[in-house]
Amino acid sequence: MARSLRKNTFVSNDLLSKIDNLNMNKEKKIIVTWSRRSAIVPAMIGHTIAVHNGKSHLPIFISNGMINHKLGEFVPTSIFQGHAKKDKKSKNEKKKN
């Protein structure tokens, strides 16, 4: 279900204040955050934000195409290891016996 239009996009206050300080000083530093639910706003363009994936912080460079998406969309929380392979060797041994 989509978010109501009368509500603004959510951005963590701490994250927004860090972005504003860097923009005022015209600095480019990596910002570390745990706020995966924060939306990407135009003030963040050009910055690198390290978002927590549950284990470590992964850096994301913010570009124009990412506006109005959430930070957590760009950092996977789990890695697909593949499906379990069938053990053919044990089946062949059972058939021979």
Swiss-Prot record:
InterPro entries: Ribosomal_uS19, Ribosomal_uS19_bac-type, Ribosomal_uS19_SF. Gene3D superfamilies: 30s Ribosomal Protein S19, Chain A. One of its GO terms (molecular function) is structural constituent of ribosome. One of its GO terms (cellular component) is mitochondrial small ribosomal subunit. The keyword Cell wall biogenesis/degradation does not apply. GO terms for biological process: ribosomal small subunit assembly; translation. It comes from the Eukaryota. Keywords: Chloroplast, Plastid, Ribonucleoprotein, Ribosomal protein, RNA-binding, rRNA-binding. It is found in: Plastid, Chloroplast. HAMAP family: Ribosomal_uS19 (MF_00531). Protein S19 forms a complex with S13 that binds strongly to the 16S ribosomal RNA. Belongs to the universal ribosomal protein uS19 family. This is Small ribosomal subunit protein uS19c. It comes from Cryptomeria japonica (Japanese cedar). The gene is rps19.
